[in-house]
Each structure stands twice: as C-alpha cells, then as structure tokens.
A protein has these predicted regions:
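SAM-dependent nucleic-acid methyltransferase catalytic core
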Residues: 1-22, 28-31, 43, 74-201
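Short alpha-helix immediately C-terminal to the canonical SAM-binding loop
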Residues: 65
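Conserved SAM-binding loop
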Residues: 68
Length: 291
C-alpha cells in the first residue's frame, strides 16, 4: 500500500507516528472500499494511507475531535492558522491553555489552545508536562520553537486529507456496529493494556474488562480487522481463533524522560527503552492480502 507524505498533526501517546511501526501497519492493511478507526487518536495511519471511498475517524476525546473538525472545515481552518501562527513558545501559555481550553466555547479558539498543548506536551502525554529543549537547536532556534513553527507546514496537507473523512465522537462499540459489512476494514489502536505498561498517559483508559469486550467484538466483526498494541493474555483468544500476529521492535519515546530534569533523554534511552508492538489480523484481512 502506497503511503502519503502527510504526517499526523501532533504527537499522541501510544500513537503510531514512529516510522517503523507505521510502515509495518500500512503494509498489513488489506484492500478495502471502506475504512474505520474506532480509536482515532492522532490519525497517524489514516492520514498516511491512500483514501478509501468512505473513511470514518472516531475518538471519545472531545478535544481531539474538535481539532479535526476545525481543521477539516475550510472557513475554520483559515482562522485557526491565523491565530495559532501568532503564538510564541511559552511555558506560561502552555499552563494557561491547559487550564482553560475545555471551557472555551468558540471551536476555533478551543482547537488552537488544544493544539498548542498537544504540540508541546512531552512524549505525547497531553498537558502532563511541557516538552522543552534546554541546549538543543534546529534551524537557528531552540528545538521546541523550531518544532512548533515547522508544525504549520504540515497542516495544509492534513486539512486536504481530513476534509474527506467522516469525524465521529462515540463509543467504540457503537462505531464497530455501525460501520461493518462487505468491503469494510477496521484498524483498531486502543489504549495499551494497563498490565503491559506503566500507569498514566491516556486521558481515556480501557479497563481489562473493556479490552476483553473489544476482543470479543472484533472476533465477530463483519469485515477485515487490523489491531495493534502490546501483547497481553487478554488478547489470547485471537491466537486461539487463528489470527495472524507480527512483532515489531520500536523505541518508546515517552519512556525517555530523565529523572532529574523531566526532559527527553538520548543515547541510553534508545538502548534500554525498547518495546515490542504486536499487529494482529483476522482471517478476512489475511484473505484479502492473498487475493
């Protein structure tokens, strides 16, 4: 499957922006007419794949859903760009916006503040801590400022891509029921099972019973399924049902926080913070790849 050069618009905890895992997932997406992501997050995969006849993005996080709705709207997008481009990189603004964005009723202003936080949060962990650079620089300015300024170069591509996508804000159960049948492919990237990682990171967690319910729903889903996450005993029914599973070794950037400064580490982090991502496919997804 040919990928586009459009990137996800912001870092997202547990997202699939890592080039290695993204390439692996894109390579396993079978042919489809219709496409749905029940756990959309930063939309790394959706934005990077070729467009399908019908595409559905869903997330229960109202902040990220409002952001994508604003970016998809031609009038709102221009206003968003004009406002966001004026903002400097500032810890005070980061903290202020972290307190105030949920109470903003203007969708454009809420999206601007939400995006500011998402772009500058360390490790994609929304509003948990400010991800700043102390001594590193790029393009004649600090890495933090350079990254913020460079993020606007990608947004017009995101705008063009997301305009054709149906944006939902609903429970994953409802989404899987509504968007299924002949020609559908569901790519699911739920929050990692709690027992496979340290606590925190997600604003909307899934409990073990939710993961069990998800697996049960995917086993009877009418369509092709590709699922990503860390392997867990909760996912054992997939192997029993004959689903294919592939493993990809990646670096967990969110684990790179140094103990003393709270900043992202380098070097030893890459040596010691390895994670094994799993990608599962159901029989229908595998059948389509063979045809």
């Amino acid at each position: 499957m040919t990928k586009s050069n459009t990137r996800a618009p912001f870092p997202w905890f547990g997202g699939k922006g890592n080039p290695k895992i993204k390439k692996a997932i894109l390579g396993l997406l079978s042919e489809h007419e219709f496409y749905v992501e029940p756990f959309g997050g930063g939309a790394s995969i959706l934005i990077s794949k070729p467009a399908a006849k019908v595409e559905v993005y869903n997330d229960v996080n109202r902040g990220v859903v409002n952001f994508f709705r604003v970016i998809a709207d031609a009038d709102y997008f221009g206003k968003f760009m004009a406002r966001a481009a004026l903002l400097p990189v500032s810890r005070e603004l980061f903290e202020e916006f972290g307190r105030t964005w949920p109470g903003i009723h203007d969708p454009v202003e809420q999206a601007v503040r939400w995006y500011y936080i998402a772009q500058q949060s360390f490790g994609g962990m929304f509003a948990k801590s400010w991800g700043t650079a102390v001594t590193t620089s790029s393009r004649g300015m600090s890495d933090t400022t350079s990254t913020w300024r460079a993020s606007f170069e990608n947004l017009p591509k995101v705008h063009d891509r997301i305009q054709r996508v149906q944006i939902e804000c609903a429970d994953w159960r409802d989404i899987l029921k509504r968007f299924s049948g002949t020609g559908w492919l569901a790519y699911c990237d739920p929050p990692y099972v709690a027992g496979t990682r340290k606590a925190g990171g997600y604003d909307h967690e899934l409990k073990d019973k939710d993961h069990e319910a998800l697996i049960a729903a995917l086993l009877v889903y009418d369509g092709a399924v590709v699922l990503s996450g860390y392997n867990s005993a909760l996912y054992a029914p997939l192997a029993k049902a004959g689903w294919d599973r592939q493993e990809i070794e990646v670096v967990c950037s969110a684990a790179g926080r140094t103990r003393t400064s709270g900043l992202q580490g380098v070097g030893k982090v890459k040596e010691k913070q390895q994670r094994i991502e799993s990608i599962w496919r159901n029989h229908e997804a595998m059948r389509r790849m063979k045809n």
